[in-house]
Amino acid sequence: MKMNILFYVETSNKLNVKNSGGIESLNKDLYKSIKKINKKTFISNKFTKKLGNKKWDIVVSSNNAKIFDNLHSKRKILWFHNKLQIEKAIRKSQLFPIIKNKINAVFNSKYLKNKTSKLYNFNQKIVIPNFLVEDFQNLKINYNRKPYFVWSVQRPKGLINVIELWINKINSKNNKVKLFIFGLQESKLEKYNLKKLSKFNIYFMGRVNKSTLIKYYTKSMGMICLGYDETFCLNVIEAYSCGLPIISFGLTAVGEMTNKNNSFLISGFKDLDSTIFKILNLHKKKRRNMTNYCINYSKRYYLQNIFPTWTRTLGL
């Protein structure tokens, strides 16, 4: 039996199937796969009267419980990508929609599930990890790495420490190694003259498209993702898909996807410079093995391997 299914992802941008990132990309890739087996599947980024008048079998909404008040649906699935504590739910007017609607919750990590308030009266709570979009699947392997390292976390916490260490302990000892910073707006780094950072081989790249990220990831030797406040961290599995190991504290949800074979876990900033030099000096065979392990590990996050859990959850 075919069901009327709606994926709702609230965004001010037009839902362009090719050019999008983050939550939008996840919704659209999952939507396209579900539509292949259930033709009456739709996606929208804004509420309309037409949506409100239609009787839905299932509505899957990303981070927004308020939409359930306006849609007629037999089953309501709230797809959690971010934390929603009680005080935030009140501030965002989401508490009452969660309480009065019978909602099934899907969390993208065990960490997020455990950090979500137990006071919410969800019908069901299930963990389904996020997945790699098509751009990051089945990439050509590059074993000839340059002395490059990347930072792609959009929040700046810890980055100032990394920059200071890079200037004082890394660049001063090896002026060939480079750090590329992606994803951050310039206003997040007001302390620094970004142009002057280049003399220390630190390059601020801003927000770029996926093909540019892949270009740098497949050339680099490591990604710095400390793990502060990450409910899943797509950056990590994207790095793995490019054969790129992680340097991390192993905190929050990042700890669920890091191990000694795909990451260099450090206990504090004091270990960062020695870890960078350790990676630079890896034996060729060790680097090759680590690259292969990262790529193979990333395949568990291919949509084809996550998809069966979604179809069971939707009852397809």
PLM region spans:
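A charged, aromatic-enriched C-terminal amphipathic alpha-helix characteristic of glycosyltransferases
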Residues: G22, K270, R288-L314
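Short beta-strand->alpha-helix junction loop in the catalytic core
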Residues: L112, I128-N138, L184-E186
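Nucleotide-activated donor-binding/catalytic signature segment of Leloir-type glycosyltransferases, i.e.
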Residues: E190-S211
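Short alpha-helical donor nucleotide-sugar binding micro-motif in glycosyltransferases
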Residues: K215-S220
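Aromatic "clamp/platform" in nucleotide-sugar-dependent glycosyltransferases that forms part
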Residues: Y228
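Short hydrophobic beta-strand element within catalytic cores of glycosyltransferases
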Residues: P245-S248
